[in-house]
Amino acid sequence: MKRIKCNKVRTVTEIVNSDEKIQKTYELAEFDLKNLSSLESYETLKIKLALSKYMAMLSTLEMTQPLLEIFRNKADTRQIAAVVFSTLAFIHNRFHPLVTNFTNKMEFVVTETNDTSIPGEPILFTENEGVLLCSVDRPSIVKMLSREFDTEALVNFENDNCNVRIAKTFGASKRKNTTRSDDYESNKQPNYDMDLSDFSITEVEATQYLTLLLTVEHAYLHYYIFKNYGVFEYCKSLTDHSLFTNKLRSTMSTKTSNLLLSKFKFTIEDFDKINSNSVTSGFNIYNFNK
């Protein structure tokens, strides 16, 4: 290729001030819409990431059956306790980001009858001779995971009846056979060498994991009140969930915004009629970011 010499040319750009201004109008609504869409996408990503971490954690338990089948099996109390305990530990770590260990002194009771359950509270906590006791309402969890609507449970919103039922439920659950958390913890052999390159899961199965995680998160909020504010405040929170916003706020060591329940905000129209003595109006109990 033949080279051609060219004379060097110097260009000069002059900036001259002018009294004339360029007029440009912006549609703020468009920017607001884009900003909102970006925030929603980011929140959705965080929810998917949290659910993926939860499912990956449960895969280390070497479960012998799918999640729904484990809770359908009445005799498989060991795996039921393992799933619930591991889920509580997972939530505890997200609620306390700097804490890596959860309590290992916990006994589990898997209940089957209505007299040992409270509607809307499939997981309850109490103490039995100084040992923390976790009561798991297996039939209720099965209905939640299989998306069955319970139309037979009797729900009475009178405070006196609620308190009596709570007392009877705790009394009945203490008489059941218990499973200690260390019974399965010592035998658990996490498998971290799984090849997940071809791993796939259906939307129905993912919904079951999400439902269980939200259910146990709800129970963990009660557990936090039980451990930090005592039995009286815990029993009170079972009938008045407005205590969540009063006692569960983010601090230097706790992050309620890490819980999936903090991503939801909803109202129930007839809530004021049901509980006129509530501190808050509406049912915005899961909005921790006030």
UniProtKB/Swiss-Prot annotation:
Subcellular localization: Virion membrane
Pfam families for the chain: Baculo_ODV-E27
Spell out where the chain crosses the membrane: none
Which proteins does it associate with, and in what oligomeric form? Answer: Interacts with host mus209/PCNA, cdc2 and cdk6. Forms a complex with proteins C42 and p78/83.
Q: What GO biological process term is on the record, naming one?
A: symbiont-mediated perturbation of host cell cycle progression
Q: What is this protein called?
A: Occlusion-derived virus envelope protein E27
CC annotations in GO: membrane; viral envelope; virion membrane
Q: Where is the signal peptide?
A: none
InterPro entries reported for this sequence: Baculo_ODV-E27
Location (main, coarse): virion
Q: Out of the domains of life, which is the source?
A: Viruses
What is the role of the protein in this entry? Answer: Acts as a cyclin-like protein and plays a role in the modulation of host cell cycle. May promote G2/S arrest by interacting with host mus209/PCNA, cdc2 and cdk6. The cell cycle arrest is characterized by an intact nuclear envelope, concomitant with sustained activity of host cdc2. However, viral DNA replication still occurs in the arrested cells.
| Family under the similarity heading | Belongs to the baculoviridae E27 family.
Keywords (alphabetical) are:
Host-virus interaction, Membrane, Modulation of host cell cycle by viral cyclin-like protein, Modulation of host cell cycle by virus, Viral envelope protein, Virion
